[in-house]
Amino acid sequence: MNYLTHQLLNPKEINLLKKNLTLQDISWEDGKKTAGNHAAKVKNNLQLDRSSNISKKCTGLIEKKILSDVLIKSFALPKRIHGTMFTKTLKGMKYGRHIDNAFMSSGRADLSFTIFLNEKDKYSGGELLIEGLNSEDKFKLDSGGIIIYPSTYLHSVLEVFSGERFVVVGWIESYVKSIEEREYLFDLDAGARSLLAKHGRSDELDLIFKSYSNLLRTLGE
């Protein structure tokens, strides 16, 4: 399956987010508000009002981290981020099997991401289940961990049995919309960076970086 798991946020950043997002005057609303017609029938969670000042402040921190992360930039080739929101799934809640919308109001959704904010031992259940062609994979990461996966996959959030699941979700529009082409570019970039770290610059490596840049120029939008 074509996905990336990665530790994105450090403890200081996590604590800052939690401090801002646990203020008493924060307004949480029914998650169905932002779901498509089909997904709304199976969505049962809470989300922070995206128009609130606290949401905009925290969203800015998240999006800045994503767009400046070297590994994420290599994997996702992010052009822009759409629809970032903070969600809570309480005891008895879940988000059933669904597919994300192809387009948000601000553009195409190529990749979906979830950032886990509370430690996984603070709640039971609540795993993110992603369905590939021949397999199903469950994810429940440590606090600050991010998973990025193609928005073309069916997925769900399993029922929370105790505690609460607290995450950030959003969507990435990539410069390269093809899953396969992004994978080729990611492998080429990773291999070139590894060679550079081990052996330093060389004429041969310059040719590899040249090929990568020109492929990205050809495939990108």
Swiss-Prot record:
User: What PROSITE patterns does this protein's entry cite?
Assistant: FE2OG_OXY (PS51471)
Look up the record and give one Gene Ontology term from the biological process aspect: intracellular iron ion homeostasis
Native organism: Prochlorococcus marinus (strain MIT 9215)
User: What protein does this entry describe?
Assistant: PKHD-type hydroxylase P9215_13741
The signal peptide here is: none
Q: Where does 2-oxoglutarate bind?
A: R165
Q: Which HAMAP family match?
A: Hydroxyl_YbiX (MF_00657)
Q: How is the cofactor bound?
A: Binds 1 Fe(2+) ion per subunit.
- Name the coenzymes or cofactors required: Fe(2+); L-ascorbate
What PANTHER family does this protein's entry cite?
Answer: PKHD-TYPE HYDROXYLASE YBIX (PTHR41536:SF1)
* Residue stretches making up the Fe2OG dioxygenase domain: 80-174
Query: What's a single GO MF annotation on this record?
Result: 2-oxoglutarate-dependent dioxygenase activity
Residues binding Fe cation? H98, D100, H155
Q: Which cysteines are joined by disulfide bonds?
A: none
